Amino acid sequence: LVRRQWDIVGREARLRGMHMCHSPEADLVRDPRFGRMSEAFGEDTYLTTQMVKNAIIGVQGNYEGLGKGTHIGAVAKHFAGYGQVLGGSNFAAIEISERTLIDEVYPPFEAAVKEAKTLGIMASHGDLNGIASHGNQALLTGVLRDQWGYEGYVVSDSNDIARLFYFMNVAESPEAAAQMGLEAGIDIDLYAEDSYSYLPEMVKKNPELEKLIDRSVRRVL
């Protein structure tokens, strides 16, 4: 039923000219104070995994629909742990043990990558166990690509590359935030006004950045 529902969503969205959607939400939500619970599928790992997997297969037309131009790309979000922010507060820190991440939090995303072939993954707001998610190379490259073999693109959440500088204070400048996000594995910056917009000038001073930019462009194309 979920697959059929999202198949209709994918077809109708494509008819309206869309090519991708920032859905489904693969987070586990376990705090009733969290204001975005209605976007997720619940607190259970198995249920969320099945719902997310079938939602992606449906909206993408089991991936074949993208090539036929009948469906749109999915973006599973928010990688990782966003549904369990401290106090249920948006942008709050996330503290989850490694065992819980592997056994409970990661499986919906792993299924999205390996079984449903999601076109996109969105990084999480805030930080995970003290490391800013949008600068977390071990997570966005080590787990997602090296362990799971993900070949799609990673998109930032809204303005979160810029927030590495002006909100989280882990980058010394907007330019440094842009480089941090790019090196971590963020291919698309949503939005780029205060971060990736600096890349054309940055690459003139540091030609090595061109390799990272080319890598991200290939993933998107």
Predicted feature locations:
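Glycoside hydrolase catalytic-domain context in secreted enzymes
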Residues: 1-221
